């Protein structure tokens, strides 16, 4: 039997979020709907999840000692990583001491960089992937590019949102890609993965929920990337029954190997009926923001239920749905928004503004959501709604 206490009392059920961006914010909201006390942690103040949490802490999550001090003081029932850049060795230690890490400390450790999860998927589980090599020095990198061949993609083993990622098409690009990867990783310079091109038709995110009652799959999500970052997503993405079955088989294999309860975003390349594993995140996925409108239970509601050991009944899809990012570019310490009434004027549209306190360069500030009679119609509506929002810097 699951028991949930009352926030801000001795009986409280406490969740501590490591990472307080827009995805963590939605998890916090869903947890609070269920009566959970939420503590939000991030490296900067007034992060989106901090704005809705019961309390918050500002600290570098790569500082294991500082992280330990907060966790020992708060004594959360669940530690919920929402980003990759965390002192995972500390999480492994804390888990051994009796703290619960979602889904597991091992999952957080393996997925904090591309090497751990790629070796698990390709070498231990035997899942098909693109050709790849890892390199830690410039000499190893040149050897890796020669072995994989051109064109190839170079990424820091620890980065997100396309940072430090580039495509090498000619010899002239080789050193530029290395230098860019050394400045774009979350932990500074270091190891990279060199990946060969997969000739795929499209890529999907297969959201997979591991919960007390088993494993549940959301409908496949298609997405559009620009500069390595998500710009649009839609659900359901049409695909053959054979490809869908193989996608779910692979998703179940890799999430089962990682273990624990929660939602996983499994990224896959599809070529005809063939499926290739790309990456997995043991947490809500940015492309899954579309589920705020596309499903009766969003990926965030599913994550909260799974974490708490609550039932996840059959999912209901609300029909063709899409999301489109509201993007800002420039510098501001107090951004504002106009055009919201125009964005929400069409039927079956929605808007989620993330409340990010600062903009420096390009930043994802919100997402427009839409339902339609077809995926094409839903995407067009979401794009119109996003375009109507003006971010004042």
Curated annotation (Swiss-Prot):
Biological process terms in GO annotation: 'de novo' IMP biosynthetic process
Keywords: ATP-binding, Ligase, Magnesium, Metal-binding, Nucleotide-binding, Purine biosynthesis
Ranges of residues in domain ATP-grasp: 119-308
Pfam families: ATP-grasp, PurT_C, RS_preATP-grasp-like
PROSITE patterns per record: ATP_GRASP
Family matches, as SUPFAM superfamilies: Glutathione synthetase ATP-binding domain-like, PreATP-grasp domain, Rudiment single hybrid motif
Chain residues that bind Mg(2+): 267, 279
Pathway(s) the chain acts in: Purine metabolism; IMP biosynthesis via de novo pathway; N(2)-formyl-N(1)-(5-phospho-D-ribosyl)glycinamide from N(1)-(5-phospho-D-ribosyl)glycinamide (formate route): step 1/1
Catalytic class of the enzyme: ligase
Entry binding sites for N(1)-(5-phospho-beta-D-ribosyl)glycinamide: 22-23, 82, 286, 356, 363-364
One Gene Ontology cellular component: cytosol
EC number of the protein: 6.3.1.21
Catalysed reaction equations from the record: N(1)-(5-phospho-beta-D-ribosyl)glycinamide + formate + ATP = N(2)-formyl-N(1)-(5-phospho-beta-D-ribosyl)glycinamide + ADP + phosphate + H(+)
Domain of life from the UniProt record: Bacteria
Function according to Swiss-Prot or TrEMBL: Involved in the de novo purine biosynthesis. Catalyzes the transfer of formate to 5-phospho-ribosyl-glycinamide (GAR), producing 5-phospho-ribosyl-N-formylglycinamide (FGAR). Formate is provided by PurU via hydrolysis of 10-formyl-tetrahydrofolate.
Quaternary state and interactors: Homodimer.
Record family assignment: Belongs to the PurK/PurT family.
Protein name: Formate-dependent phosphoribosylglycinamide formyltransferase
Organism in which the protein naturally occurs: Nitratidesulfovibrio vulgaris (strain DSM 19637 / Miyazaki F)
């Amino acid at each position: 039997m699951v028991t949930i206490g009352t926030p801000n009392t001795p009986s409280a059920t406490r969740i501590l979020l490591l990472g307080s961006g827009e995805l963590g914010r939605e998890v916090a909201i869903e947890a609070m709907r269920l009566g959970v006390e939420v503590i939000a942690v991030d490296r900067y103040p007034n992060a989106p999840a901090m704005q809705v949490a019961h309390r918050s802490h500002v600290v570098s999550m790569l500082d294991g000692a500082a992280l330990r001090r907060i966790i020992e003081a708060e004594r959360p029932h669940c530690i919920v990583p929402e980003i990759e850049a965390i002192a995972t060795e500390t999480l492994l230690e804390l888990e051994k001491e009796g703290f619960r890490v979602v889904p597991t400390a091992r999952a957080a450790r393996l997925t904090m960089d591309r090497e751990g999860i790629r070796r698990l998927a390709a070498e231990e589980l035997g899942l098909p992937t693109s050709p790849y090599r890892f390199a830690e020095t410039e000499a190893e990198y040149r050897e890796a590019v020669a072995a994989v061949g051109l064109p190839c993609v170079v990424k820091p083993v620890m980065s997100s949102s396309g940072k430090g990622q580039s495509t090498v098409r000619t010899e002239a690009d080789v050193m530029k890609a290395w230098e860019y990867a050394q400045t774009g990783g979350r932990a500074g310079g270091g190891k990279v993965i060199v990946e060969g091109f997969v000739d795929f038709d499209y890529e999907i995110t297969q959201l997979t929920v591991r919960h007390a009652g088993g494993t549940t799959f959301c409908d496949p999500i298609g997405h559009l990337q620009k500069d390595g970052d998500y710009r649009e997503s839609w659900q359901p993405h049409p695909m053959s029954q054979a490809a869908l079955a193989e996608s779910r088989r692979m998703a179940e294999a890799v999430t089962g190997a990682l273990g624990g309860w929660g939602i996983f975003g499994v990224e896959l390349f599809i070529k005809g009926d063939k499926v290739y594993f790309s990456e997995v995140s043991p947490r809500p996925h940015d492309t899954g923001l579309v589920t705020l409108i596309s499903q009766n239970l969003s990926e965030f509601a599913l994550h909260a239920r799974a974490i708490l050991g609550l039932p996840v009944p059959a999912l209901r899809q609300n029909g063709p749905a899409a999301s489109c990012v509201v993007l800002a570019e420039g510098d501001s310490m107090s951004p504002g928004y106009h055009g919201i009434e125009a964005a929400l004027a069409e039927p079956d549209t929605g808007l989620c503004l993330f409340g990010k306190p600062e903009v420096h360069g390009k930043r994802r500030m919100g997402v427009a959501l839409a339902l339609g009679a077809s995926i094409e119609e839903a995407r067009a509506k979401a794009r119109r709604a996003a375009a109507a929002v003006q971010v004042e810097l």
